Design a protein with these regions (language model features):
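Protease-associated
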Residues: 73-115
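Non-transmembrane functional regions of envelope-associated proteins
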Residues: 1-80, 84, 113-187
């Protein structure tokens, strides 16, 4: 029950990186991860999600220069120690766990993977070993085979890079369509 703190990397690492981002994922009430907040931070949502930070490094890519998609957060006064999120987007997952190519770090270090496998590619590094990663249940994996955090972030990056995010229907439209589909079998 202590105060939430934002901890930056040690200075030598912080000085060496081209950008920093958050990897905060909120599960929906049913325990499934379907979305991401593109910006988050203490008292102000200023950190981009890791995938957005990566995309912003590629200033030549059109998606890096577009306005952020997503549902805006309601602004209200909050304590300075509150975690704030903004620009929520639903994700169109590219596929189930294992959809993106992945390589063992050990195999890469031992030159067992051809350099061509990485040429002109965006590369995310993370743990996928059972019990050593942040496994997330997703709509394409469910609870039986959770998706690794690095693959979840690859899906976020892929969706942003392609400009593909899912928008939620406004509540009034959702209610109307529910009514229409409920009455449809009676017609």
């Amino acid at each position: 029950g202590g105060q939430l703190l934002e901890t930056l990397p040690i200075p030598v690492l912080a000085a060496a990186v081209a950008g920093m981002g958050h990897v905060d994922v909120e599960l929906d009430p049913d325990g499934i991860a379907r979305s991401v907040y593109l910006r988050a931070g203490l008292n102000s949502p200023y950190w981009p999600t890791l995938a957005l930070a990566l995309l912003e490094l590629d200033s030549a890519h059109p998606a890096a220069r577009q306005a952020l998609p997503g549902q805006r957060a309601v602004t209200s006064p909050v304590p300075s120690y509150a975690w704030r999120r903004d620009y929520r987007v639903l994700l169109p997952f590219a596929g189930p766990p294992g959809h993106f190519p992945h390589f063992s770090y050990n195999d890469v270090l031992r030159d067992r993977i051809a350099p061509a496998a990485f040429r002109n590619k965006y590369v995310l590094v993370g743990s996928t070993a059972t019990g050593m990663n942040d496994a997330l249940p997703t709509p394409v994996s469910g609870l039986a085979r959770p998706m690794s955090g690095v693959e979840y972030n690859a899906n976020v990056f892929d969706a942003l890079r392609q400009g593909l995010t899912i928008r939620e229907l406004p509540p009034n439209w959702s209610l109307l369509l529910t009514g229409v589909f409920t009455l449809l079998p009676m017609a």
